[in-house]
Amino acid sequence: MTPLSSPLSQYWQTVVERLPEGFTETSLSVQAKSVLTFSDFALDSVIAHPEWLAELESASPQADEWRHYAGWLQEALAGVCDDASLMRELRFFRRRIMVRIAWAQTLSLVDDETILQQLSHLAETLIVGARDWLYAACCREWGTPCNPQGVPQPLLILGMGKLGGGELNFSSDIDLIFAWPEHGETRGGRRELDNAQFFTRLGQRLIKALDQPTMDGFVYRVDMRLRPFGDSGPLVLSFAALEDYYQEQGRDWERYAMVKARLMGDNDDAWSRELRAMLRPFVFRRYIDFSVIQSLRNMKGMIAREVRRRGLKDNIKLGAGGIREIEFIVQVFQLIRGGREPSLQSRSLLPTLDAIAALHLLPENDVAQLRVAYLFLRRLENLLQSINDEQTQTLPADDLNRARLAWGMKAENWPQLVGELTDHMANVRRVFNELIGDDEADTPQEEERSEPWRDVWQDALQEDDSTPVLAHLADEDRRQVLTLIADFRKELDKRPIGPRGRQVLDQLMPHLLADVCSREDAAVTLSRITPLLAGIVTRTTYLELLSEFPGALKHLIMLCAASPMIASQLARYPLLLDELLDPGTLYQPTATDAYRDELRQYLLRVPEEDEEQQLEALRQFKQAQLLRIAAADIAGTLPVMKVSDHLTWLAEAMIDAVVQQAWTQMVARYGQPAHLDERQGRGFAVVGYGKLGGWELGYSSDLDLIFLHDCPMDVMTNGEREIDGRQFYLRLAQRIMHLFSTRTSSGILYEVDARLRPSGAAGMLVTSADAFADYQQHEAWTWEHQALVRARVVYGDPQLTSQFDTVRRTIMTTARDGKTLQTEVREMREKMRAHLGNKHRDRFDIKADEGGITDIEFIAQYLVLRYAHEKPKLTRWSDNVRILELLAQNGIMDEHEAQALTVAYTTLRDELHHLALQELPGHVAQTCFSKERALVQASWRKWLVAV
């Protein structure tokens, strides 16, 4: 045994002062002196339990004593009567055996491979012992879980990572996956549970028994995140659920993890054999799978970035040439060829390395260097961790611990140890680079910019590591950003994303995060983009679009940041992402007079007889145009009046196309009404009321429509299935309503409200022009005449359009008693305010409250109805702005008042548009728009209150 170096001999004096009672410097062996000087963990343990030191002095640990662990633990648990005493005994047992392993390792009484085996067997023994005790306890409480045939069901535990490979390090957490075979219920207990409930409760108690810190410490930190769906998934899964997941959604990294998976307890019962057989095809492909190279290259890139970001030159696990790279080298061959070469299917690294050599997959010299380097690094790692039973792979900076490691590694001093370490890691790095290749695709500038965000995305940051990359954000925003990323990753775990989709997503996200997180509104913007991404993660084409076209990504971020409405539209209808490719068209809406032509050309791509595709095409065209209008609105290239103009022209184009489709379908079924045989046109018109009639549509406005025809009585259609002509027009209107409202994968086209027709909902859906005229002259209420002020034909034959315009003009130019009209309009407004008024007393409803938009509309309508009999030109336009102009031009309203009302009206409408883009309700603080409101209220009093 190597004598203690000078620094350690000096430290021994400190150890002597802490020796337990009954032990002196002279009474201890050289071996004890060496171990207690090297490991503070061992020293603290024997101070608390002097009998352990006496036991070790009398009989040194043996290489094969791991075979006795299960029996020793069974004896220790014999007197356990509850969970608390179980936890105490487990912790006591673990510490006792770990001291023995530390003793053997420090003194090199056992070779390093055996040390790894002992550490792994200890963990397995404790896991299985705790499981078995708790299983029996749970069965006593709830009965034994059985399948429908009454066969008892066990809890099977997969040990992952180094635990599964029999290569556990000294201070390690343990990665586990819990499973049970078949569904069923418990039998024989005080209360029945289904098997899922039973095993979930058992799993929770097992984790607590192992993981929960007590005054005696903990047994192992338990990590369950490798299970299907991670933390968001069930704690325990049935075999069927496991099989479905790995067949449908298993990802590359889960394949890699499953290579080392081993059932704890190593039972050879039928259930264990079934689970192993089920998992094997997922891990080892029958064909030679070279796609592994790119996947591992990506993982290697992540590690390289981690090394650079955190300066991990002293990290013997993750650093260049460290333990992880040796593991990657071995896994490459396992995953590429393991399906055809059973010798490569070992869970343990060293036997697999031997198989690689035997198959001549690597030169013998490379394999030899990797073996020596691996054992060197693993010994160094375990010695480092055994000093304080601390999970670390970073070399120490203090002289004492450096002296300890140099002595433990049989180096003369620290520089010599570092030199040997450097040589080994250089050998590993060379083989690694030759095999996996260095695929740094990004430019240095892109790499530098996206590197921290790649780490954020890969969930590789520690809790406080994110501060520098998000330092410009407030604490709450920073937390929100990290939470959004974590929640999005959990959501992804639930999605059946293929390998290509995962790869593209991993390429895209660092760049997206770099752009989003550089913004002051990063949290808000990211909250709008992640639902969109969640909607397209299973559609790789869209991910590739954003990944391969940085400009499209930048436009996406800008638009989503500006408008949650746009973000919602893109999330619902990802086909719109194509619109982001060309900024020339994105921010330049179609010319107002070109929507019909654009739509007609668009529909030419779709077979006319394919109704379903026609419906989809209509909706997709509308959504694309809506996006372009909104983008131009956000960019400031469209003022509010022009936004409404574009939205109105778009709606008219859609109405035109819908009527065309409905007409074609009806005529194919019934022929057309016979009165059209001798004339052009269709004898049909669609009248737009409200915002559509007034050229004032907003982004989410519905359409107020009525339908007119000019079909005489007793006319039949001329098809093989002839029907009454008026019945034809009724069915045509019904068909139009259906085409508007049918919900396809692209949503509905528009909400349509036809209640403004004569007699409202009680009236016929379609009315003859003559009946409409008669109703307006003899039955309509004043409010219906007000509505007529804002009505116009948006689709129809010239003859019917002219007929409607005549009716409208006649009604509006009818002389009325001014006082009666004033009272009726004012009372209608008061009824509306009482029914629809603002429910938020401390807020101003821009449309409904006093001084708002509706008041301006009522003023304009009142004045048209009041004075049009004197000034027929007042009937020319149906929109409020031009009506106000006409009122000023015809001397009804002072020009200054008309202009002021126009400014107030457009200002308030502009605010409504922007609130719609933000998906916010149409009310603001009471203090807003006080000047505009006061002006409107004064005008209201002047026209509708004054005697």
Curated annotation (Swiss-Prot):
The record's HAMAP family line, in alphabetical order, gives: GlnE
Cofactor requirement: Mg(2+)
Belongs to which family? Belongs to the GlnE family.
Q: GO:BP terms for this protein? A: regulation of glutamine family amino acid metabolic process
Top EC class, one word = transferase
The ranges of region (Adenylyl transferase) come to 450-947
Q: Name one Pfam family in it.
A: GlnE
Q: From what organism does this protein derive?
A: Salmonella dublin (strain CT_02021853)
* Cystine bridges: none
Q: Which GO terms describe its cellular component?
A: cytosol
What is this protein's record name?
Bifunctional glutamine synthetase adenylyltransferase/adenylyl-removing enzyme
Please give the InterPro entries that the UniProt record associates with this protein: GlnE, GlnE_rpt_dom, NT_sf, PII_UdlTrfase/GS_AdlTrfase
Q: What does this protein do?
A: Involved in the regulation of glutamine synthetase GlnA, a key enzyme in the process to assimilate ammonia. When cellular nitrogen levels are high, the C-terminal adenylyl transferase (AT) inactivates GlnA by covalent transfer of an adenylyl group from ATP to specific tyrosine residue of GlnA, thus reducing its activity. Conversely, when nitrogen levels are low, the N-terminal adenylyl removase (AR) activates GlnA by removing the adenylyl group by phosphorolysis, increasing its activity.
The answer to keyword ATP-binding applying to this record is yes
The molecular function terms in GO held by this entry are:
[glutamate-ammonia-ligase] adenylyltransferase activity; [glutamine synthetase]-adenylyl-L-tyrosine phosphorylase activity; ATP binding; magnesium ion binding
Provide this UniProt record's keywords sorted from A to Z: ATP-binding, Magnesium, Multifunctional enzyme, Nucleotide-binding, Nucleotidyltransferase, Transferase
Give the CDD domains listed for this entry: NT_GlnE_GlnD_like
Question: Where are the stretches annotated Adenylyl removase?
Answer: 1-440
| Keyword Nucleotidyltransferase in annotation | yes
What Enzyme Commission number(s) does the record list for this chain?
2.7.7.89, 2.7.7.42
Q: Which residues form the signal peptide?
A: none
Catalysed conversion reaction: [glutamine synthetase]-O(4)-(5'-adenylyl)-L-tyrosine + phosphate = [glutamine synthetase]-L-tyrosine + ADP; [glutamine synthetase]-L-tyrosine + ATP = [glutamine synthetase]-O(4)-(5'-adenylyl)-L-tyrosine + diphosphate
